[in-house]
Regions:
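Amphipathic terminal alpha-helices
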Residues: 209-224
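Active-site Tyr-X1-5-Lys
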Residues: 45, 57-85, 111
Length: 224
């Protein structure tokens, strides 16, 4: 998200162009079902319990680009008779994560005993361990369900302050937390309703936030 928002001239064409390319090939070669990986950013500011049919009002460029990808998916589906599913993950983290994403960044600071900077520690994110996200996406791809959207998340949002405190506790760090206020780049978020995925896909996240963070920390230690 950050890359697209900071460099939209290059970032937006990659998101939309890649999606269009994949959709064209999916239609051209008779793909059984196209699964589009969108983002919770398409909702913009949202509260706990947000469902898939809730209003989509992105507050940043990345969210708008992903929402455009959703619209393109539906247009190709209507034009070419392509079955599709839209998956909206949130705050995915875990082994192999990019270093500038929030969980990776907090771990890096904690391991180095450096201050962890928050942009509004009360803002929440429905952090989802990567194995749960992958599990949900595979469930969606292999299901007989088509032509709808799913929130694939942990279904339990956590504040950035709690995230930082938990990482400090897991790592035994001496880091201090500094809250410098809200960034306009990111929306106010909460818990996404995953009942549709539970009912139709039998999706059930397996990792609590702490379990996911501990697993990620084990991986980071072995990597170091």
């Amino acid at each position: 998200a950050k890359i697209v928002d900071k460099d939209p001239i290059n970032g937006v064409p990659k998101v939309i162009g890649t999606t269009t390319n994949l959709l064209w090939h999916a239609s051209e070669f008779g793909t059984k079902k196209f699964v589009y990986i969108s983002s919770s950013m398409v909702y913009g500011d949202f509260k706990d319990g947000t469902r898939e049919e809730s209003n989509t009002k992105p507050t940043n460029i990345y969210g708008e680009a992903k929402l455009t990808g959703e619209r393109l998916t539906k247009l190709f589906a209507k034009r070419d008779g392509l079955n599709y599913l839209i998956v909206r993950p949130s705050g995915v983290y875990g082994p192999g994560d990019l270093p500038d994403r929030v969980v990776s960044k907090f771990f890096d600071k904690a391991i180095k005993n450096e201050d962890i900077t928050l942009h509004n520690g009360e803002n929440k994110v429905d952090f989802t361990y990567r194995q749960d996200a992958a599990y949900g996406i595979v469930k969606a791809a292999l299901s007989d369900v088509a032509n709808t959207s799913f929130n694939i998340t942990a279904g339990n949002a956590t504040s950035l302050r709690t995230l930082a405190e938990t990482i400090i506790e897991i790592t035994g760090s001496k880091s201090e937390i500094k809250d410098i206020g809200m960034q306009s780049l990111y929306p106010m978020r909460g818990t996404l309703d995953i009942s549709r995925a539970k009912d139709l896909l039998e999706y059930e996240p397996k990792f609590t936030l702490r379990q996911g963070l501990e697993s990620y920390y084990d991986w980071l230690q072995n990597k170091i």
